[in-house]
Amino acid sequence: MKNRVITISREFGSGGRTIGKQTAEKLGIPCYDAEIIQTMAQETGFAPDYVQEAGEYAPGGFLSSAFSNRMFGPTNEDILWEHQYKVVTDLAAKGPCVIVGRCADYILQDTADCLKVFIHADMTFRAKRIVEVYGEREQSPEERLRDKDKRRAAYHRFYTNMKWGYAQNYHLTLDSGVIGIDRCADIIAQLY
């Protein structure tokens, strides 16, 4: 099966973004990550930082869900989700590419030529990596990982009604802590 689009979902600190970029480089195709946030910001008029932050939080609370669309129209989060959906589908339609995050696995689930990948690793590997790569020092790395993963899972569940990281929702799951970041990119590129 030829895959025109590869989606990379990932646990925070697992190297998924790096794996996506390396895979795209090996295949000579574009990798979209921060570009999605920039496009959404341009289209909506929201600041890129706001778009990034909102993409990590599921709209919450009883009042938010009970009143958002019925009484007051769509929330900012709903507007961003609609734009995210559009940007991801437009990028996939342009041609072969790698898309990192942004619920692309769900958005493109009915696309026959899409390879859906989930990257994970154990807590020790990820904690060490976020300190080395991002200089995380504000709170314990483990706390930061749990918080970020919890937010990603909640956001994914809210908009997709699917369990984030659940193996059956992906074609391939890879443990970057065991396999290595470079080798993960090699494996994905070989499956393309």
Feature-to-residue mapping (PLM):
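ATP-dependent small-molecule kinase phosphotransfer cores
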Residues: A41-P96
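RNA pseudouridine synthases
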Residues: L91, A104-T111
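Small-molecule kinase domains that catalyze NTP-dependent phosphoryl transfer to phosphate-bearing small molecules
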Residues: P59-A66, D78, R137-D182
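Short beta-strand-centered segment that lines the nucleotide-binding/catalytic pocket of NTP-utilizing
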Residues: P30-A41
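Pre-Walker A (Motif I) flank of P-loop NTPase domains
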Residues: K2-E11, G95
